[in-house]
Design a protein with these regions (language model features):
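N-terminal presequence-like segments and the immediate start of the first folded domain
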Residues: 1-81, 87-139
Length: 139
């Protein structure tokens, strides 16, 4: 397959390590559609989430990572049309509501895209408590 046959352009934010086996986001060629891969609460440059990192902190970092990837694709938070969040413990997510709400306000303000939240048994990093993926339409 030649590069011209690929139906998307991969996105890598400045200063981020290229992931193995996936792209942080893709922009579909011929469209303004951006698909953002699941982002966990790991700071860019870290290899793992530090043990004991709480759900609110992980949510803030994961959501910030989604926005960083979106900006690298040429978008802004208000271009998000959908988010999907996977959490390992809904009760812990609910208990962290104030921290999550504050992170949302700081990161997305009053923008509320369509959203799904589901509990899963585990995520790629054993310390991960949340993974957020998104979709955006650029103007």
């Amino acid at each position: 397959m030649s590069p011209s046959d690929i139906a998307y352009t991969a996105v890598l934010p400045d200063g981020w390590t290229r992931p193995r086996g996936f792209s942080h986001a893709v922009v579909a060629k011929g469209t303004k559609s951006v698909r953002i891969a699941g982002q966990i609460g790991r700071e860019p440059g870290q290899s793992h989430i530090p043990p004991g990192t709480d759900a609110g902190t992980q949510w803030r970092v994961a959501l910030s990572n989604v926005v960083t990837v979106l900006k690298a694709a040429g978008g802004e938070p208000q271009h998000l049309v959908a988010l999907r969040a996977y959490v390992t413990d809904i009760a812990e997510f609910n208990a962290a509501g104030a921290a999550i709400g504050a992170a949302w306000g700081t990161t997305l303000g009053k923008h509320f895209p369509a959203m799904t939240l589901v509990q899963v048994s585990a995520l790629i990093d054993p310390q991960a408590k949340v993974e957020i993926e998104g979709e955006a339409i650029l103007p």
